[in-house]
Design a protein with these regions (language model features):
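PPIase-associated folding chaperone regions across multiple families
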Residues: 26-29, 138-212, 255-357
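Sec-dependent N-terminal signal peptides
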Residues: 4-16
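Peptidyl-prolyl cis-trans isomerase
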Residues: 215-259, 289
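Second-shell loop/turn segments in exported
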Residues: 81-96, 105-115, 145-150, 199-223, ...
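FKBP-type peptidyl-prolyl cis-trans isomerase
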Residues: 30-69, 103-109, 114, 158-167, ...
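Basic/polar, acidic-poor N-terminal "presequence/leader" segments
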Residues: 2-3, 25-26
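C-terminal motif of bacterial Sec signal peptides marking the signal peptidase cleavage site
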Residues: 19-23
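N-terminal targeting/tethering segments
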Residues: 27-143
Length: 357
């Protein structure tokens, strides 16, 4: 059977194509999958029908990307497990967390003046109707889709997008030059172990070749003092740039070579280093700027984005901490990804679009 995807409202990334028909297992669509309760508010309940649909939509998106590479058993294959959970378990957990977040965000819309207008509702309804009409009854049954579930899915996606924007807008956007300050250097990295041959394949240096590489690197370091770029060209060394600030991670944590950063910190603009020893390599660097204005502005944007993301996470975590969340594990265990979705032929992959920003 074939599913046609549609672009509507936000993130309806249903890369759905064909799959074998076996129905929805034993899912009881009217059973309650998730219950969220608090002392001062009515309980929030999410049905198995909706939760199953949300999970199968996620499955379809993953299948369209990964199934052809990793095989039909990739959902439960322990080779792809992480933190003791296979992919099916991990994605099902993610679906639950997403549903919980979206339902709680819906309850707090008034806190941030967020609304879903009648025009939005009409666009959602139209997109859902198009999706339902584009796909066969058998296909819709397999994914657990109904007009109600598709509308609800798109509605909650829209709520989540607008609430995230509204919450993020309250983050502190004041970032000083001192906090964001970036230094920038250019560098040549000279490997002492491997090189790429003319055919593009990686080869390993012999002991004699390594001796030559080291001698060339030493000569290049001396010449670079007067002509950094010319030396790089002469020895066919690539020149790259790197910007960093006071929050630069250590090399062990994924940052740049510690010895290089230490050298850069001791240099003034225009100064060229000698050979700096790294892990199986040498570096030669030139400090280009002690305060890179462009890089600093980009860093400010990054800091603000991180603050916004953290604030959103803190707010949604707070919503969850304020309620008691119960998942019917027996019902949820029935949802599985045994059948693999495959992408439809290009001619059958049409879109019906609706937007609500």
């Amino acid at each position: 059977m074939r599913f046609k995807k549609f672009a509507a409202i936000i993130l309806m990334s249903t890369m759905i194509g064909t799959m074998s028909l076996s129905g929805c297992g034993g899912v009881n669509k009217d059973a309650v999958a998730i219950t969220m309760t608090s002392d001062d508010k009515d309980a929030i309940e999410v049905t198995m029908g909706y939760a199953n649909f949300a999970a199968r939509i996620q499955q379809a998106g993953y299948d369209s990307v990964f199934a052809s590479y990793y095989g039909d058993d990739y959902w439960t294959n322990d080779s792809y497990a992480k933190d003791g959970k296979n992919m099916q378990e991990s994605i099902k957990d993610s679906v639950l967390e997403s549903i919980e977040t979206q339902y709680l965000l819906e309850k707090h819309m008034s806190d941030y003046g967020v609304e879903i207008t009648e025009e939005d509702q009409a666009a959602i309804k139209k997109a859902a109707e198009q999706f339902m009409s584009d796909n066969s009854k058998a296909a819709l049954k397999e994914v657990g889709a109904t007009q109600e579930y598709v509308e609800r899915y798109l509605y909650l996606q829209t709520v989540e997008k607008r609430m995230k924007a509204a919450i993020s807008a309250t983050a502190d956007t004041n970032v000083s030059d001192e906090e964001a300050a970036q230094r920038t250097f250019s560098y040549m990295k000279i490997s002492l172990t491997t090189y790429t041959d003319e055919s593009g394949k990686q080869q390993t240096y012999s002991a004699d070749e390594t001796t030559v590489v080291k001698k060339n690197a030493d000569d290049a370091a001396q010449k670079a003092q007067s002509d950094f770029d010319g030396t790089a060209q002469e020895y066919s060394y690539d020149v790259k740039t790197y910007s960093y600030g006071s929050d630069e991670k250590s090399e062990a944590d994924g940052g740049f070579c510690d010895a290089v950063i230490a050298a850069a910190n001791s240099m003034t603009a225009g100064q060229v280093s000698g050979l700096i020893e790294g892990a199986d390599c040498y570096y030669i660097i030139r400090l280009d700027s002690e305060f890179d204005a462009d890089a600093t502005e980009k860093k400010k944007e990054s800091i603000i984005s991180d603050r916004q993301d953290q604030l959103y996470q803190d707010v949604t975590d707070g919503y969850k901490d304020a309620v008691k969340i119960k998942v019917d594990e027996d019902e949820w265990a029935i949802v599985n990804f045994d059948n693999i979705f495959t992408a439809p032929p290009a001619a059958d992959n049409s879109d019906s679009s609706a937007t609500a920003e």
